[in-house]
């Protein structure tokens, strides 16, 4: 077991009841193009087309052969594009239950599948996009070979779902998915299954699966943390990672021949009336999913964690491909008298400069950052929440200044935006380090 000490479990109110309920019915789903780093689509459909579940919507021009499929059957009602014609979302009005079928196998055949059989089924169904690479967090090329594959079966994000609750309903599907993954490279690559201590995660002694437990505060449950401690990456070495619900979907694909797009997400946060786990589907319209669920007032719905999720509004008002939670907090627009110096008891700070830092209560966090952006202040805040073996203050300084050579030497290739979310949260200068990291990674990938 690997135990980390640095980190922070955010004391936010609205923790979900760990019981799965059926969510609101949604009649719109979407594929969000901007989730896929560096992807340039070649569209295979247009507005007004009727598509089946599992039908190809577009292909990545820059990653030949990688296709993105419809999460539900229905009519294409919108193809939204932003600046420079960047694909924002492909929206489907859900109608009917027609679907494309794929190769299916008996459970007893899974352990003898060839790498080509596994890859072909994953690619054709669109489930290849469940994989992401580290470094760069991109969908891998079809001819890429990772050092290993990481399956994340734990979650320490604020307000997260307990994976064990979901896996209890799909034990055999999860084991089938692990078996399929173990055959992706003919059994030559280790599958690292990362879980919480004492969790009852099924493995059924699948070949090439190595189980590692992680303990400690967030970010103990992030894939970036797991990769750093088990099989760290570099500019010449990569690994792939995916979450446990996609492993379930892979297991179901190979045993049923059908694309499984159900998702169990936590619907939680200070502004949710009844925080709980809800069953919905990939790409669900979040306005419909949260209808009647939220407290009065101006709320921000987030696809993903409050620390690193995406604001769900307008053309982005849908559950993301990699999101396992929907978080809701209030928009913090109120001005507070003497807000910088009053020792409030209803506020939280890692620096213990407010009375609330000394209590163990949960706080109704809002979107307010309590100050304007300013220079970095190196007072040890970053070191308190960064468990990885890097120098966070120096790394963040280099990211802010655009010095990619130094940032690469300090370990930025190991990171994804979510790995710096706590640094952003505790930053006295109110800096957002996620876009700085992405700009650095893009530059390194392009220029070396």
Swiss-Prot record:
UniProt EC number: 7.2.1.1
Record flagged with keyword Ion transport: yes
Keyword Ion transport applies: yes
Lineage of producing organism: Bacteria, Pseudomonadati, Pseudomonadota, Gammaproteobacteria, Pasteurellales
Protein name: Na(+)-translocating NADH-quinone reductase subunit A
Similarity-based family: Belongs to the NqrA family.
Species of origin: Glaesserella parasuis serovar 5 (strain SH0165)
Listed Pfam families: NQRA_2nd, NQRA_N, NQRA_SLBB
Purpose: NQR complex catalyzes the reduction of ubiquinone-1 to ubiquinol by two successive reactions, coupled with the transport of Na(+) ions from the cytoplasm to the periplasm. NqrA to NqrE are probably involved in the second step, the conversion of ubisemiquinone to ubiquinol.
């Amino acid at each position: 077991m690997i135990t980390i000490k640095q980190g922070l479990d955010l004391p936010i109110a609205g923790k979900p009841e760990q019981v799965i309920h059926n969510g609101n019915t949604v009649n719109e789903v979407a594929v969000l193009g901007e989730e896929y780093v560096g992807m340039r689509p070649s569209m295979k459909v247009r507005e007004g087309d009727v598509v089946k579940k599992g039908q190809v919507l577009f292909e990545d021009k820059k990653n030949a052969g990688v296709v993105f499929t419809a999460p539900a059957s229905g009519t294409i009602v919108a193809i939204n594009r932003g600046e420079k014609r960047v694909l924002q979302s492909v929206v489907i009005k859900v109608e009917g239950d027609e679907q494309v079928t794929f190769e299916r196998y008996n459970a007893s055949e899974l352990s003898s599948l060839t790498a080509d059989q596994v890859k072909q089924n994953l690619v054709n169904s669109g489930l290849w996009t469940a994989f992401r690479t580290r470094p760069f967090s991109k969908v891998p090329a079809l001819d890429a070979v990772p050092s290993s594959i990481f399956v994340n079966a734990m979650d320490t994000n604020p307000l997260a779902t307990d994976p064990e609750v979901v896996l209890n309903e799909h034990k055999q599907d999860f084991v089938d998915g692990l078996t399929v993954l173990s055959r992706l490279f003919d059994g030559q690559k280790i599958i690292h299954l990362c879980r919480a201590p004492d969790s009852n995660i099924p493995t059924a002694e699948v070949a090439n699966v190595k189980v590692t437990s992680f303990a400690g505060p967030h970010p103990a449950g992030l894939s970036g943390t797991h990769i750093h401690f088990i099989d760290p990456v570099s500019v010449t070495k990569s690994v792939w990672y995916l979450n446990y619900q996609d492993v379930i979907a892979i297991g179901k694909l190979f045993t049923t021949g059908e694309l499984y797009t159900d998702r169990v997400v936590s619907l939680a946060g200070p502004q949710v009336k009844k925080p709980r786990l809800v069953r919905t589907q990939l790409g669900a319209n979040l306005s419909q999913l949260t209808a009647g669920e939220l407290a009065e007032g101006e709320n921000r719905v987030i696809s993903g964690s409050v620390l690193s999720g995406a604001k769900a509004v307008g053309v982005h008002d849908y559950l993301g491909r990699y999101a396992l939670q929907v978080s809701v907090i209030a928009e913090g627009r109120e001005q507070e008298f003497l807000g910088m110096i009053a020792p409030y008891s209803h506020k939280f700070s890692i620096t213990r400069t407010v009375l609330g830092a000394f209590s163990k209560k949960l706080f109704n966090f809002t979107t307010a950052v309590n100050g304007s952006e300013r220079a970095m202040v190196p007072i040890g805040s970053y070191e308190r929440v960064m468990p990885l073996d890097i120098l966070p203050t120096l790394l963040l300084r280099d990211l802010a200044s655009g010095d990619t050579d130094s940032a690469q030497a300090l370990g930025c290739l190991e990171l994804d935006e979510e790995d710096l979310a706590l640094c952003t949260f505790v930053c006295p200068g109110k800096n957002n380090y996620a876009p700085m990291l992405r700009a650095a990674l893009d530059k390194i990938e392009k220029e070396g």
